[in-house]
Amino acid sequence: MQFPESWLRTFVDPQLTTDELSHALTMAGLEVESLRPAAPPTEKIVVGRVLEVVKHPDADKLNVCQVDAGTGATLQIVCGAPNVAPGIKVPVALVGAKLPPAEEGGAPFAIKLSKLRGVESQGMLCSARELKLSEDHGGLMILPEDTPVGQDIRDALNLDDTVFEIKLTPNKADCLSVFGIARETAAITGAPLAAPDIRPVRAELTETLPVKISAPDLCGRFSGRVIRGVNARAKTPRWMVERLERAGQRSVSALVDISNYVMFELGRPSHVFDLDKIHGGIDVRWGKRGESLKLLNGNTVELDETVGVISDDAQVESLAGIMGGDSTAVTLDTTNIYLEAAFWWPDSIRGRARKYNFSTDAAHRFERGVDYSTTVEHVERITQLILDICGGQAGPVDDQIVNLPQRAPVSMRASRANRIIGVEIDKDEIAQIFTRLGLAFERDGDVFRVTPPPHRFDIEIEEDLIEEVARIYGFEKIPARPPVARSEMRATDETRRSVHAIRHALAARDYAETVNFSFVDAEWERDFAGNDNPVRLLNPIASQLSVMRTTLFGSLVGVLRHNLNRRAERVRVFEAGRVFIADPAVKAGELAVEGYAQPKRIGALAYGPVVDEQWGATTRQVDYFDVKGDLEALLAPVVARFVKAEHSALHPGRGARIEVDGRAVGWIGELHPRLMQKYELPHAPVMFEIDADALVARALPAPSEVSKFPPVRRDIAVVVDQKVEVQALFDEMKKALAEDACKFVQKVALFDEFRAKSNTSSGMSAHEKSLAFRVTLQDAAGTLQDETVDQAIQTLVDRMARVYGARLRG
């Protein structure tokens, strides 16, 4: 949005300098991108009157002019402009004057006393282009008759005016006009707002144009009037041309300029039809497939049912709310016109211009929303200017209202506004802010019920009103309050270690940390978690990142594949991250979302050689027991049980459930062969995933006395059915340690396993196996006697025999 400061100050004139006004607008959300002078610097250029014009004696295209420039003496100036004539007033550059450089960055053009074809010239008569006021170089810049002779041209044309360029956010459609900016300025500064003086024009004709609105979802209100006898060749007043140019709009013709002027002034695009080119009445409707329209810009567009049009009895005449058609365009020969101003529903205009690869000021405004209550007033304003400039006789305004927005009140709680803004704003001050913004409201204690005005399409929810309060209150008045945290010593729980310590421990065991998205491919969830109903994202950033993960296995395999594709041979990675599981038992809290558990887990993956290639170690592929050893070291001193179980992502015979104190805390094992084949992995990676809490918790270290007496070691071999797991025997022996007979048992370790191929002299059947355990016993108070040791060993054997049918091997 671009406009001159002088135009703005005709509506509101706060006691602020240009820079202060710019800062105030920016801090209220109307970002001023640039301030620039209306014209480049000039010196010694004044208003002069041409007194006499005679032909140059030695040049056909030059004239010798006598000029009164208010200096007390008549100046002789040689001029080649085709429109020079006695009596006109023009800008005169005196000797010593400086004009803007011909090219940007060049030196100013200095005027000197010179001779042109032997005739002395005491200055220069200037065109608008030479002053860098416009691109018009067809002749001299003719000034209004009432401009004082001798006045500095900068004062005469207000060239020290400042042009504001404001970057508006899409929701601020109410500021796409000078009056809209003025309305905001008045609210921000408290300066009085002078509304435009719009008076109804007396109708001298009774004629109206038949109008039918067939699409109320396209057009909610349509106002128009007939004006006859206009002079389309009338010259646009200099003040209007000046304002349009400083708003970035070139002058076209009086009728077009007036329509554009009111759009920049009040924010409503309008359209002027050549009445004599309209066939019958007009119909506001949706387009039809197969129809086409040649637009004012020369393009011909193909229409369909998604585009609104204005048609007459013969053809389509305009692209509704976007651009008029060429067939009814006004020309310099136009004498009768039909003036239209309407309310177009934003949804019916949005995106239609872009569909045809162009944009217009009208579409830019209508797709954001334009005041639907002022169509008649704007028709009256345009009519007033047309009659003043072009003459003519106006008919009555035909105003058809079929479907206007029903704006529901929006409630705002003052307490919530204060909490969000971060400062206590008095309720009376909030009421004053709403009054300054022109927002009608009802107040009920802490609650303000605001009815959005017709020009504010951006007020729909409570947060919109809170934004308005913050803007007008002033962001600069909101104090900067950095978060304050009390500095105090906090006790460290010695029974817990941080996740950072776990990261360091894994890094020390040659694992590299990786960080992955918490959202993954739905196929990963099926493959690695057996989950067909994951937590889905409402707005995923990519189709392959559409669900929240419930396991880290998929992310780790994804990292493995990424590295293998880059010719890595040995990969050891881990991740400490959260998974997301639907759980109705979870209640909402500061760090919790109702219905969803978000536990933190530690996952790791090892692939390839167990060690880097070297001369001192044999190369082999990493296996289950390598990774199990890493996990046991990570858990120490906690001892976990590894229970044979099946997981959808793990090898059926090489995977286990991890249990700590009887509670399942994770999984470990080789990747399932099916997934190896699917993800094209040459070897099986070994992975584990475990709850972070199981690794964080640790027992408080307790000192124990080192015995001065030697330990006793006994080996026992028991025969059991091959289906009996070693872990089950360990569990039974661990239970026996609670008995008094086994109180001196320090350690039990398996050191041998034997399986008979058939019934042999070993005394074992083919379905049995022999397990050899080494039992270490020690007493801190004295040397153990054989009787005590024998009793402990017998207790262990009896327990295994009672539960699993174990017998000592003979």
From Swiss-Prot:
InterPro entries named among the record's database cross-references: aa-tRNA-synth_II/BPL/LPL, B3/B4_tRNA-bd, DNA-bd_dom_put_sf, Fdx_antiC-bd, Fdx_antiC-bd_sf, NA-bd_OB-fold, Phe-tRNA-ligase_IIc_bsu, Phe-tRNA-ligase_IIc_bsu_bact
Binding of Mg(2+), residues: 458, 464, 467-468
A GO molecular-function descriptor: ATP binding
Gene3D superfamilies associated with the record: 3.30.56.10, Bira Bifunctional Protein, Domain 2 (3.30.930.10), Ferrodoxin-fold anticodon-binding domain (3.30.70.380), Nucleic acid-binding proteins (2.40.50.140), Phenylalanyl-trna Synthetase, Chain B, domain 3 (3.50.40.10)
Keyword Magnesium: yes
Named cofactor requirement(s): Mg(2+)
EC number of this enzyme: 6.1.1.20
Annotated ranges, domain B5: 405-480
Cofactor descriptive note: Binds 2 magnesium ions per tetramer.
Catalytic activity field: tRNA(Phe) + L-phenylalanine + ATP = L-phenylalanyl-tRNA(Phe) + AMP + diphosphate + H(+)
Coiled-coil boundaries: none
Domain FDX-ACB residues, every copy: 707-809
Pfam families listed in its UniProt record: B3_4, B5, FDX-ACB, tRNA_bind, tRNA_synthFbeta
Localization, UniProt: Cytoplasm
Enzyme class name: ligase
Domain tRNA-binding stretches: 39-154
GO biological process, one term: phenylalanyl-tRNA aminoacylation
Keyword entries, A-Z: Aminoacyl-tRNA synthetase, ATP-binding, Cytoplasm, Ligase, Magnesium, Metal-binding, Nucleotide-binding, Protein biosynthesis, RNA-binding, tRNA-binding
The organism's place on the tree of life at top rank: Bacteria
GO terms under cellular component: phenylalanine-tRNA ligase complex
Known partners and oligomeric status: Tetramer of two alpha and two beta subunits.
Family: Belongs to the phenylalanyl-tRNA synthetase beta subunit family. Type 1 subfamily.
Protein name from the UniProt record: Phenylalanine--tRNA ligase beta subunit
Species, as recorded: Burkholderia thailandensis (strain ATCC 700388 / DSM 13276 / CCUG 48851 / CIP 106301 / E264)
Source species taxonomy: Bacteria, Pseudomonadati, Pseudomonadota, Betaproteobacteria, Burkholderiales
